[in-house]
Amino acid sequence: LMINGYFDLSVGTVMGFTAALAIGLQPLSIPVAIIIAIAAGAGIGAINGFFVAKAKINAFVVTLGSFIGVRGLIYIYTGENALVGQNYEFYSFGASRILGVPTLFLIMLAFALIGNFALRRTAHGRRTYAIGGNVEAAENAGIPVDRTIFLNFMLCGMTAAIGGVLLASRLNAATPGLGWPDTNLMTIATVVLGGTSLTGGSGSVTRTLGGLFTLGVL
C-alpha cells in the first residue's frame, strides 16, 4: 500500500478487532471464527479503499476515521474486558514449532515470499509501482488506478486481519488495547526503514523484512 503512495492508520485497530473476533466467536467453531475475522478485516479495508479511490477523500482522513470507528467497535464487542480463548487447538497452533522454528515465523516468511512474488511478477504489482511513481502517467497508460488502489486497501485490511488472528492464537486472548496505537507507527517505521518511500513508487517486501529485523534488534 505504501508503494502505492498511501498508508493505512487503521491497521492496528483492525488487528485488535479481528483478534477479538477470533477469540469471541470460537463457540461457533474455529474455522468460522477465523473466516469471519478475516472477512471483517477485508471489509474494513474495502471501505477505506472505496472512500480513497472512488470518493477521492484523503487517505489520512479516511483511515484515521476507520481507526477511531474500529476502536469503538473493539470496546463495544469486548465490553472493555479481556477475552480469553477456550479452544486448546487454537492456542497450541500459535505456540507450535516446526523443526524448532516457530510456526508463526514460518507463516510470516511464506507471506513475505508471496507478497514479493506478487509485487515483482504480476501485473497488479507492476501497476502498484507505476501508480506510486506517477499516478497521472499511470492513468494515461491505461492502468486502472482506482481499482488497483481499492484492491491494495482491501488487501491491507485482510492481511492485518490475518495478523490479528495469528496474534490471538499466540496469546490465546484479546484485550481492548491489543494492536494499537503502537502497531500503526511501528508498521510505518518498519516499511520506511526497509527503504520504501513515503511518497510511493519504490520499495520491496524483502527490504521491509530487513527493516523489521533491524527494528527488532534496536
What would you call each of these model-derived segments?
Residues 29-67, 110, 210-215:
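Alpha-helical transmembrane segments within multi-pass membrane transporters and channels
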Residues 160, 171, 175-218:
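Transmembrane alpha-helical segments in multi-pass inner-membrane proteins
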Residues 114-154:
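Membrane-helix/interface signature in polytopic inner-membrane proteins
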Residues 1-29, 50-57, 191-205:
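Single transmembrane alpha-helix segments in multi-pass membrane proteins
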